[in-house]
Amino acid sequence: MRHHTKNLRRRAIFLRTTPRGNMDSSSSVATSTSSSSNHRLVRSSEGSPSAGGDDIEEVIMTPGIATGRVQPAVSVAIPDLFTQLPPVKDDLATSTSKTQDETVAICLPYLAGSDANADVEHNAHGVPHIDRKKHVRFLRNMLRQLPAPFIAADASRPWFLYWSLNAMAILGENVKEDYAESLADTARSMQNESGGFSGGHGQTSHLATTYAVVLALAVVGDEEGLSLIDRRALWKWLCDLKEADGGFRMSLGGEEDVRGAYCAAVIISLLNLPLDLCKDSEAYIRDPTANLFTGLGDYVRKCQTFEGGISGQPDAEAHGAYAFCALGCLSLLGTPSETIPKYLNIERLISWLSSRQYAPEGGFSGRTNKLVDGCYSHWVGGCWPLIEACLNGPVKVSSLDVEPQPLFSREGLMRYILCCCQEQGKRGGLRDKPGKPSDAYHSCYVLSGLSSAQNRWQLVVGDDDMPAWMVSPFPNEEEIFDEKDRVGTVHPVYVIPEDKVAKVQTFFASRDGF
C-alpha cells in the first residue's frame, strides 16, 4: 500500500486540477507560519565551489503553506496543481519523505510567483522570463580562471567547456567568434597520441572527456578546431575499449557502463569513424566478423532493471541519466521505432520515466524516492522525444500537423525550470532547485530540457525514404512562456544545437579516409 500511494502522488502531475480542500495544518511540509508575516529560510551553499556571486540564498515562505496552498503574489493563471500539496500523501514519515516535504515547501513560493525577489517579472501565466544576459555572464565567468576549490574538478575541465559553450549557444550566443582559437589550443593539449582526449595535459584518455571535447568543438563549429581531432588514433583507441559483451570501457582498464555505449556511439556517428575493428585490437582477434556496434544493443538490454528504468551496469539501480544514454545509443544504432523496442521493454520504461515527474514541483527526479533536480529536465525530459519517435515511427510530412498526445506534463516541467531553476540573484546561471547554487552543469542540462519541452521533435520520412529529425513548435497549443523566452533547438540525441550536428557530419563526410 505504501508504494501504491507514492505512485499515485507522483502520477498526480498528469491531473489538470486537484481538490481545494484544506490540508492538515500540522503537515510536516509546514514551517512556523503566521497570518501576518512571511518567514525566511536562509540556506548556505558553503562547501560548494563557487565562481563568485551570491553564496547565500534567501527563500521566502509565504503564509498558506501550512494549509497546503501558496497564494500567488499577483493575479495570474497558475493551475492549482502547482500551488498546493498533492491530494494523496503517504502517512508514514521517513527521512526521505521529510526531505521531499522540505523541497516542496521551498519550491511552492517560486511556483506561485510569491518568492522573495520582487524584481523578478512574471508573465500572464505566472512564469518568470529567461534572464539571458545574466545567465550568459555567469557562463562566460565559468570559462575564465576559476577559484582555488575548482582544482578538485581539474580532470573535468572538458566538461566545463562543453557545458558552458553549449548553454551559451542554446541562449543564442555566437560562441565561435569568441572561443574558437582558445578552445582549439585547450583541446590540443588534452589529446593523447594514443587516441582520445583526457581531462588535461598528461592525463589518461577517457571516453567521457573525449565526448565532452568533441561536442565542445562541434558547438563552436570551427573547421580548424575540428581538424585537430586525430580520428585514426581515436578510432584505434575505441577499438581497444570494445568489450566482448558488446559494451565499451570508459578508459583502458576502466569501468564498463552504459555511458560508454552512448558516448562511443555519438563519437563514431558524429565524426564518421569506420565501424570496422582495427585488426590488432583484442576485439578483432576475438571475433574478426564483429564491428564497433556488434552486441551494443544487447549490452544496453542487460541494463534494464525490474523497475523498468536503466542502470549504469547490469543488476544496478535505475537512473535517469542512464535511461537517456541507453535511448540515445539505440537511436544511433537504427531507427528508434525498430531498435528501442527490440532491446527494451518500452511499456515498463515509460512507466518508470512517468514516475519521475512530481507534483506540485513539476520537475523530474533521477531515481525512485529521490528529489527533483533541474539537470533531469534533460536526462529524463530528453528521453521523451526518443520515446515518441519509438512509438510513432517515422512519419510522412503530411502527418506533421497531427495533434500530439503528450506523455508528460510539458507545462509542469517548464514551470519548474523557469520558476525554480533560474538563479534570481546577481549571480545568474541555472541550478538544481531553490537553495542550491547555479553551476555550468545544471545550466547546460536545464536549458537543454527547456528546449526539449518547448519544441516537438519527429522523425520525418522525405522523398528519399530516409528518416531525418525535424523540429517544430507544438501545434494549436497556448504556451505558458512568452515567445521571447524561447531558446534554441537542441538535437534530441547529440544534445548540441541541431544545426551544428549537420555541419560537423557534413565536414567529416567530405574528408577522404582519416
Curated annotation (Swiss-Prot):
Gene: RAM1
Region annotation (Disordered) ranges: 1-56
SUPFAM superfamilies associated with the record: Terpenoid cyclases/Protein prenyltransferases
Binding note for cofactor: Binds 1 zinc ion per subunit.
Top-level EC class: transferase
Descriptive protein name: Protein farnesyltransferase subunit beta
PFTB repeats: 180-221, 231-272, 293-334, 346-388, 410-454
Pfam hit, one: Prenyltrans
Annotated Basic residues bias: 1-13
Gene Ontology CC annotation, any one: protein farnesyltransferase complex
Classification of source organism: Eukaryota, Fungi, Dikarya, Ascomycota, Pezizomycotina
Catalytic activity from the UniProt record: L-cysteinyl-[protein] + (2E,6E)-farnesyl diphosphate = S-(2E,6E)-farnesyl-L-cysteinyl-[protein] + diphosphate
Comp. bias intervals (Low complexity): 25-39
Sites marked Important for selectivity against geranylgeranyl diphosphate: W159
Cell location: Cytoplasm
Family: Belongs to the protein prenyltransferase subunit beta family.
